[in-house]
Amino acid sequence: MSVLNREQNLVINPALGGTALWRFACGYSPKDMEAQHAPLPLLFIALPIVLNERFRDIVLGTQKSRGLSAFAEKFYLTKFKEVEKDEIAAISRGVPQYRKFTLNSIAVAIRTNLISLDADTARILPMHHNNIKNIPKSVKDILDASEKLGIWCRGTDLAAVQNLLSVSL
């Protein structure tokens, strides 16, 4: 295995992906709103966004209260020089590219009791909301971005998410 492949496996692995999806589910279903759970298809947009450093930085740099539309808007405004207008297409391309990885990450998250899948409703619920302590900043950023993305998706219906991010789920 090459050094690059080994580094990718250390950073992009189903355990990290599963943990990020758990934080997404926590954002979507906060403790005080446990009856509202994330639709399974939404999990397929989370990893292509939060595991991409550029997109993750944009999520982290967007105010939580502004929502998903403010994140998507940054791809269309010319004043944001760090983002090219056609980069939102990279999210759309990332969804099918990450599909198998996302499925593996979901499986890990379920096996480790981070999330549960309601087979009747195809919704994901977090098994707990405990914070993880003493983690590297790079991992914390991924988890924080994932949770924020979950919060934003909670306030946006599935069709609007697909439209804003130009994705097909």
Region annotations inferred by a language model:
Residues 68-80:
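Extended amphipathic alpha-helical bundle segments that form the ordered cores
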Residues 117:
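Short beta-strand "wing" residues that participate in macromolecule-binding interfaces
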Residues 122-127:
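Minor-groove-contacting beta-hairpin "wing" of winged helix-turn-helix DNA-binding domains
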Residues 128-169:
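Glycine-rich, aromatic-bearing surface loops/beta-hairpins
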